[in-house]
């Protein structure tokens, strides 16, 4: 079967003024160690929305880093992959070398190769190149037949959540508050349930998403409720929660997190803040209460493999998060929907 798109391909890029454009471009040449993948599904991430609608949007900015698809062509020197293979492709891939300070210390997402590697021209294209570096450093995972491409497009965001969880200590029957219950916020709730947390509080301003969170046996609270801190403390024996995950870019949410985390608890900064953002914190309070602050950026290929296993084994049912699908030609409409969040969780683009 011929899966190729021919000599031309479509890609989506930032046009400026809060718009995207779909461009027909010449298909780039395939290197002897590269592969072409026909995108079947790609999720829209909050960082993609920020690129389009935020103050950092600029023409030609690449979009899409959650793609999965079918291999359409392979370079002459490629081993272990074949045309027709169904794959997840990771955009950034570290070196994993013992000689790399970052990788050898478990900070793979800080590796310079992680930043320099990528899919070409981007994941949000009907076809894209996976370069040799990604291919030979575990950046491509073959998919079991029972996993759909839409599920595979959820591997990367779930992997990001898993990486965050690997950065702090917790115990069964602990309590957690998740601030911001978009797709990754719900994934954090799913992981908390999987890991045996006794109390899961979900906070947001979006009533649709709060109602959605109730499906996962959580206690939901509007984050603008003036009694949030009192409610959480009353439910936790006046102690506060063991863990707070801030799964939003809101700095107000980050500040609020310190008001209802317990002594010796952990605040996880997961949502992506805007560049240059600053907040005021009472460092004396943080010090005296021994509050741990953890940051988590992106995911390594250890995390993507873990995410694939959790999805494949049905430990995490990511299908529950997919509410809308759009065709590549409808990308502008898809991004506007993702920005509004109206009755939506995860939005997937298909080609």
Where do the model's predicted regions map?
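C-terminal hydrophobic helical "lid"/dimerization subdomain
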Residues: 2-7, 226, 255-259, 301-351
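NAD(P)H dinucleotide-binding glycine-rich loop of Rossmann-like/cofactor-binding domains
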Residues: 97-179
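Residues in the short beta-alpha loop(s) of Rossmann-like NAD(P)-binding domains
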Residues: 205-206, 273, 299
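Glycine-rich cofactor phosphate-binding loops and adjacent beta1-alpha1 units
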Residues: 168, 211, 216-290
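Mid-domain Rossmann-like dinucleotide-binding core that forms the NAD(H)/NADP(H) cofactor-binding site
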Residues: 145-226, 230
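Glycine-rich beta-strand-centered segment in the early N-terminal region that forms part
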Residues: 28-42, 55-101, 141-144
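Short glycine-centered segments of the SAM/dcSAM-binding site in methyltransferase folds
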Residues: 86, 175, 265-266, 292
């Amino acid at each position: 079967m011929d899966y190729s798109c021919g000599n031309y391909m479509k890609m989506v890029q930032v046009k400026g003024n809060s718009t995207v454009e779909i461009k027909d471009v010449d298909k780039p040449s395939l290197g002897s160690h590269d592969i072409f993948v026909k995108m079947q599904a790609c999720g829209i991430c909050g960082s993609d929305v920020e690129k389009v609608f935020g103050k950092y949007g600029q023409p030609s900015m690449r979009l899409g880093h959650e793609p999965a698809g079918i291999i359409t062509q392979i370079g002459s020197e490629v081993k272990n992959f074949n045309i027709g293979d169904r794959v997840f492709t990771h955009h950034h891939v570290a070196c994993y070398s013992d000689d790399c300070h970052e990788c050898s210390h478990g900070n793979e997402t800080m590796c310079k190769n992680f930043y320099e590697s990528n899919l070409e021209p981007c994941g949000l294209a009907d076809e894209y190149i996976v370069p040799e570096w990604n291919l030979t450093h575990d950046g491509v995972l073959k998919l079991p037949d029972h996993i759909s491409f839409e599920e595979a497009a959820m591997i990367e965001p779930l992997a990001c959540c898993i990486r965050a969880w690997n950065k702090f200590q917790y115990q069964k029957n602990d309590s957690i508050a998740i601030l911001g219950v978009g797709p990754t916020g719900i994934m954090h709730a799913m992981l908390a349930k999987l890991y045996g947390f006794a109390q899961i509080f979900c906070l947001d301003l979006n009533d649709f998403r709060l109602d959605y969170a109730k499906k996962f046996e959580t206690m939901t609270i509007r984050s603008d409720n003036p009694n949030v801190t009192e409610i959480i403390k009353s439910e936790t024996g006046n102690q506060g929660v063991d863990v707070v995950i801030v799964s939003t870019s809101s700095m107000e949410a980050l500040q609020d997190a310190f008001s209802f985390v317990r002594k010796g608890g952990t605040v996880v900064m997961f949502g992506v803040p805007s560049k240059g953002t600053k907040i005021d914190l009472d460092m004396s309070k943080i010090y005296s209460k021994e509050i741990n602050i953890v940051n988590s950026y992106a995911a390594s290929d250890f995390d993507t493999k873990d995410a694939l296993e959790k999805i494949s084994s049905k430990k995490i049912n990511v299908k529950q998060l997919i509410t809308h699908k759009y065709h590549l030609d409808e990308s502008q409409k898809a991004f506007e929907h993702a920005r509004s969040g109206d009755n939506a969780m995860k939005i997937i683009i298909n080609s």
